[in-house]
Each structure stands twice: as C-alpha cells, then as structure tokens.
C-alpha cells in the first residue's frame, strides 16, 4: 500500500499503529521518530520491524504518509523537524483528540501547501508506552477523519483505506462537529474523573482514612479514567 511511512511518537497509539501496519503489511518500510530514550529502548527490546530515527536530520526520500502520535502542544515543533520529508504526495495526519485549534495553527503557521488530513482513532487505554501497544487496538473501533472543503480527495481515500485495513470503522466529520462531540463524550468525563480522584485522595490524606481502599465500582471506574496519560491533552 505504501513504500515509506513515518510514525512520529511511539507510545501506546504509535506503537499500536506500528504493530498493526507490520501485521497487515501496510508499508515496505516504516520509520519511527522518537525522542524518549526509554521508549527507544523498549521498541528495540520488542524487536519491532522498523527503523528508529534518533536524528531527525537524517534524510528520508519518498515518504508516503506521516502520522503524528504525540501530544498536541508538540505539533508545530514536529512540523519543523519533519518538513523536509514532506512532498506533494505525502499525506500528513495525526491521532489527536482536539482538532480545530491545532488544525488552525498548522494552516496559518506552516507556509507550505501540505496535504493535512486529521484523524482521531477512538481507541486507547489508561496505560501508556510502546510495550502496551496492540495490533488489534483499532479493530472494530471508530476512527474520525476530518473532511473539509479543501481536502485532497485522493489522499482522503488512501487514508480511509489505511485506517480500514488496520481494523477501524470510518466516520467523516468537520472540525467543529468533532470537537463538539468529543468535548462532551471524552474531555469532560476525563476532567470529572481527574477531579473526583484528586478529591478522594486529598480527603484521605487530610482525614488519615483509607477511603480509596474501600472504593466500590463507581470510584474504580473514575480511577481507571484518571490514570490515562494527561500529557496527551496538552
């Protein structure tokens, strides 16, 4: 399907995309750009069939698709590092859970005409890191693709095929529709969970009482949600 794919950031989602792409033989060559020494060590230990780029200055030619799997605040920095890999045929996508602000910044601050089509696979876990990656993470799960009036239709079709091939069910949304839906179904529940667990822990500390120890199913569900990596929201 592809000759070269570059995955930027290889945590839970990035490593799951990597594993699924290897399993489905999506690309002849898969590159991973990762700055975490711990993650690099884990990827090597897992013996995943990819080339790790420790140095973003290394030249790669004919990159068909770049998938950004980092937290949102890193996007503009990443674009400066990967810009040399992008040509007119390169699809650039991401897996972030907030779209309108980030996409707006990319369009206004990145001067080059790039084929940017944002993705949001509705899959994940409270755990993080490449060792928790799962080639079946996206199987039967929704993946939202942002479809605006300027989208490259050929690239959208290719990106749809990619996500479908690794198991996702595709739905198309506008930036506004996406952010409206997931602010209610995902962001607010996480915010409530973080505050609920923090309140319980503070109360336990102040009262010197084992509150969390005796939590029933309700609070346990909150703790699972609150355990997810908060840096991905920044």
Regions found by a protein language model. Name each.
Residues 1-58:
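NAD(P)+-binding Rossmann beta1-loop-alpha1 motif at the extreme N-terminus of oxidoreductases
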Residues 35-36, 70-71, 95:
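Short beta->alpha hinge that forms the Motif I/post-I loop of the SAM-binding pocket
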């Amino acid at each position: 399907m592809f000759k070269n794919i570059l995955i930027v950031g290889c945590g839970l989602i990035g490593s799951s995309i990597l594993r699924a792409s290897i399993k489905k033989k999506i690309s002849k060559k898969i590159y991973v750009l990762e700055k975490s020494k711990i993650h690099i060590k884990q990827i090597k230990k897992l013996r995943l069939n990819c080339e790790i780029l420790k140095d973003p200055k290394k030249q790669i030619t004919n990159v068909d698709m770049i998938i950004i799997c980092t937290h949102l605040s890193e996007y503009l920095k990443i674009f400066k590092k990967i810009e040399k890999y992008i040509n007119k045929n390169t699809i650039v996508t991401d897996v972030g859970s907030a779209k309108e602000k980030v996409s707006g910044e990319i369009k206004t601050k990145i001067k080059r005409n790039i084929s940017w089509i944002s993705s949001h696979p509705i899959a994940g876990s409270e755990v993080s890191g490449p060792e928790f990656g799962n080639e079946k993470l996206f199987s039967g799960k929704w993946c939202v693709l942002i479809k605006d009036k300027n989208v490259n239709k050929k690239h959208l079709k290719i990106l749809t095929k990619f996500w479908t091939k690794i198991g996702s069910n595709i739905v198309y949304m506008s930036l506004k529709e996406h952010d409206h839906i997931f602010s209610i179904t995902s962001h607010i529940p996480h915010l409530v969970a973080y505050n609920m667990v923090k309140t319980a822990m503070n109360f336990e500390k102040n009262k010197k009482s084992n509150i969390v120890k005796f939590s029933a199913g309700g609070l346990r569900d909150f703790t699972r949600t609150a355990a997810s990596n908060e840096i991905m929201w920044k």
